[in-house]
Swiss-Prot record:
It comes from Sodalis glossinidius (strain morsitans). Belongs to the UPF0213 family. Gene3D superfamilies: GIY-YIG endonuclease (3.40.1440.10). InterPro entries: GIY-YIG_endonuc, GIY-YIG_endonuc_sf, UPF0213_domain, UPF0213_GIY-YIG_endonuc. This is UPF0213 protein SG0387. It comes from the Bacteria. Residues 4-79 form the GIY-YIG domain. HAMAP family: UPF0213 (MF_01029).
């Protein structure tokens, strides 16, 4: 079975709120949010701006990343967004070989 590459993303609403989510297709999910579908907390909060995205690898890893980011304070999330890809190790989120676009080592 082929597994999809999962991504962590953060969206900023017009009021400045940061929303954290996961998906296998960031652009499709952003479009869905923009149309009012998806998360109820984003409905009517546009325009929405994608401020962070990173491949995480498998669904299990991205769920852990999402949980960790959702536990951050607003100030910490702002710092996370400011650091972009450098934020991952800073906040204890390790990149897998798969997420970095490399093939996993053969067993």
């Amino acid at each position: 079975m082929c597994s999809s590459l999962w991504h962590l993303y953060l969206i900023r609403t017009a009021s400045g709120m940061l929303y954290t989510g996961i998906t296998t297709d960031v652009q499709r999910r952003l479009d869905q949010h923009q149309r009012g579908g998806g998360a109820k907390s984003l409905r009517g909060k546009g325009p929405l701006t994608l401020v962070f995205q990173s491949p995480a690898g498998d669904r299990s890893r991205v769920l852990r990343w999402e949980y960790r980011v959702k536990q951050l304070s607003r100030a910490q999330k702002e710092h996370f967004v400011a650091l972009q890809e450098q934020a991952l190790p800073h906040f204890g989120l390790e990149h897998s070989a798969l997420a970095a676009g490399k093939s996993a080592p053969a067993r």
